[in-house]
Amino acid sequence: MRRTRFISVCLSFVACVIFLAARAQKDEEIARLEKVMGWKAGQVVADVGAGEGEFGFGAARVVGETGKVYLTELDEKKRKALEDEVKRREAKNKVVNVMVVQAAEKQTNLPDNCCDGIILRRVYHHITAPDEMDASLLRSLKPGGVLAVIEFPPRKGLTESDPVKGVPANRGGHGIPQKILVAELTHAGFAVDQTINDWPDDSYCVVFRKTAP
């Protein structure tokens, strides 16, 4: 009985440590995104493929009531969960400026020229129609707006399909080579603003800018 209880306590402790480490990493990423993207009060920011929305909610705290944040999600269950989370935070007066948008395979479903900044965190390597999506991302940004793409090099042996089903064959595994990411987005009309190769969890971040017409 004591042994079982001891094991249970140990497992709970390990789970707590893992959770806190993951939370600290996300907080670090949010702080770095704020810096490299230049978030300011009153701006409009979108988190495309937002998942649980941590990065979009992080942006919402910075842009404030005079700004706006879009959280887009393709998966219907995740989108509904985001909507529920927004309502929960609104009820506690934690957010007043966040809108959830149903994403699409080939476009952001965001208004044209609406965003000062767009985040794609570990999303780009899932995109099955990069030419169309890249064009949509460009349209969604204001002139001078920034696009921050966080990705990781191709990896073998992940639990998901390897590479992701339906993506271009040049990915080389689950993930995307930085060189290919940059080539595709510059071809779409973006300009590289900066490249950060020491992003947490063996990832990289490339910040692009939509040049003024």
Could you describe each region identified by the protein language model?
Residues 60, 131-146:
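A short glycine-rich, Lys/Arg-flanked "PGG" loop and its adjoining helix->strand segment in the class I
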Residues 114-131:
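A short SAM/SAH-binding and catalytic strip from SAM-dependent methyltransferases
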Residues 173-188, 192-195:
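Short alpha-helix
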